């Protein structure tokens, strides 16, 4: 340095010793410089950590939680910002993390599969910056997962009594391009978008469509209560095996616990071998009066409402 110099410029931190010589006298002075910061902070984004929620489909997440690390060896970290985007391009819009944050979380709102990246930007106290971003993750909202399953309907329950089995028809909607299976009332499965099942007894019939991608499911149930395969119950009373000078009154009592008793027909016949197909009389009450002389058998035919 010249004898008239009053300052010196240094570019690095460290100890600097100055010697002043005047004749035979030498004076030394050491100065420490420690506030020079020319380096950017460091930052990195780790892999998925606790709190991450994976959908039933492997590699697709409804929530992701990523660990972050950052440091600055000199002036120190002042601010950490983050941004979730769909690409590796450095974002223009950022949010500020709370001081000391070690993780960043994202809960998906997307209705379709979407690629997400976490970007972080670290500032030191001299406004040097460092950016880093995560690997790509595929996300979809929990609502979309639940709603991804096709919808299903079932119809065809009889509205009037019948003595035949009922044909029930089920149909899917919103199924195009989806991976699903339909679980039928008997436990069998189908991958068709529609089909039929047969109801052979009264009861509830449920069909379920299960989404094989995300595990959601929808069901439809129909109540069948108009099947009647059982004949009415009939009891006959009255009449006598002995000769009588009076009219004979026969009482026919019918009941049916399902569709109910329908039409009742009868005919007085002279022997039990005759099964009449014509000439039957409709019975409007419960009693039949036989007035003619002779020996008769009452042939009756009772219907239910099925």
What are the language-model segments listed below?
Residues 1-306:
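Low-complexity, disordered linker/stalk regions enriched in Pro/Thr/Ser/Gly
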